[in-house]
Regions:
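Conserved GNAT-fold acetyl-CoA-binding loop/helix
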Residues: 17-45
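Conserved acetyl-CoA-binding loop-helix of GNAT-fold acetyltransferases
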Residues: 95-108, 127-135
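A structural signal for short, well-ordered beta-strand segments
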Residues: 85, 118-120, 160
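Conserved catalytic-core motifs of GNAT/GCN5-like acyltransferases
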Residues: 72, 77, 119-122, 134, ...
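Acetyl-CoA-dependent GNAT
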Residues: 35-92, 103-104, 109, 163-164
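A short beta-loop-alpha structural element at the N-terminal edge
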Residues: 4-16
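Conserved GNAT acetyl-CoA-binding A-motif
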Residues: 110-122
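Hydrophobic adenine-recognition pocket in adenosine-nucleotide-binding enzymes
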Residues: 8, 89, 122
Length: 164
C-alpha cells in the first residue's frame, strides 16, 4: 500500500465514525463508552481546518483505513501553538505503519500550521499507542491517575508530548 493522506471531509464522517466506534469495546483507546453518531461528529469536523487544525484520512481502494486529527488544546489563546493529536486505524489495517506514517506527517507539518508543541492523551494501559508515540520522539510529560472508569475499572491517563 502506498501511503498518502488527504484532508477529511463531511462525506468521510461515516467511515471516520465507524473506525472510531470500533475502538470503543476494547476500552483502551477512548473514554466514550457508547458509539458516536455521524451527526454528533459534524461540530467536531467543523473545528478542523487545513490551515490550523487539520483532519487527515488515509484511503485504501477508496475506503478510509486511518485518520489523524489535530485538535486545539484547552481552548485558550495562549495555547494556540499547542495541538493534541488523535490517531485511529481501522482494525484490519493495524501493524502496517499507518499510525507511524500519520504521526510522522503531523510532526513534519506542525510548523506550517504554527504548532510547536504536540500532545497525546493516552490511557496508561494502551501500550501499543504509548509505544508508537514513544518511537516518534514523544516523552511522558504527565499522568493523571485513575481519572477514567471503564467497566468498573479505574484507568490512568498518560500525557505524552513533543516539541517540534
Amino acid at each position: 500500500m502506498q501511503l498518502r493522506h488527504r484532508t477529511g471531509t463531511r462525506r468521510d464522517l461515516p467511515q471516520i465514525a465507524e473506525i472510531y466506534n470500533a475502538t470503543i469495546p476494547s476500552r483502551m483507546v477512548t473514554a466514550d463508552t457508547e458509539p458516536v453518531s455521524v451527526e454528533s461528529r459534524i461540530p467536531w469536523l467543523e473545528e478542523h481546518t487545513p490551515e490550523r487544525r487539520p483532519l487527515w484520512v488515509v484511503e485504501d481502494a477508496g475506503r478510509i483505513v486511518a485518520w489523524l486529527s489535530f485538535s486545539s488544546f484547552y481552548g485558550r489563546p495562549a495555547y494556540r501553538k499547542t495541538a493534541e493529536l488523535s490517531v485511529y486505524v481501522h482494525e484490519g489495517f493495524r501493524k502496517r505503519g499507518l499510525g507511524s506514517y500519520l504521526l510522522r506527517q503531523a510532526i513534519g507539518h506542525a510548523p506550517a500550521i504554527k504548532v510547536d508543541t504536540l500532545l497525546g492523551f493516552i490511557f496508561g494501559h494502551n501500550e501499543p499507542s504509548l509505544a508508537l508515540f514513544g518511537r516518534l520522539g514523544f516523552s511522558r510529560w504527565g499522568e493523571l491517575p485513575k481519572v477514567a472508569e471503564l467497566d468498573g475499572i479505574e484507568r490512568d491517563l498518560v500525557i505524552v508530548g513533543r516539541r517540534v
